[in-house]
Amino acid sequence: MKKIVIVGGGIAGMGIANTLADKLKGKAEITVINKEDFYFAGPSRXIL
């Protein structure tokens, strides 16, 4: 089994982790390394 390590658990890191998990369907172990032990998705602001 392949092992994938993603450094950074922000919106991009979590996004690619979810995308890879969907595409690889258990064929790889995905680890996300982040300085925090949680992920907070706050509301986005409108771009004016």
Swiss-Prot record:
Record's protein name: Ambineela
Superkingdom as given in the UniProt entry: Archaea
Organism listed in the record: Acidianus ambivalens
Known partners and oligomeric status: Monomer.
One Pfam family linked to the record: Trp_halogenase
One GO MF term: monooxygenase activity
Cited SUPFAM superfamilies: FAD/NAD(P)-binding domain
Known role: Ambineela is a blue protein and has a pI of 8.7.
Record PTM: The blue color is due to an unidentified non-fluorescent cofactor, covalently bound to it.
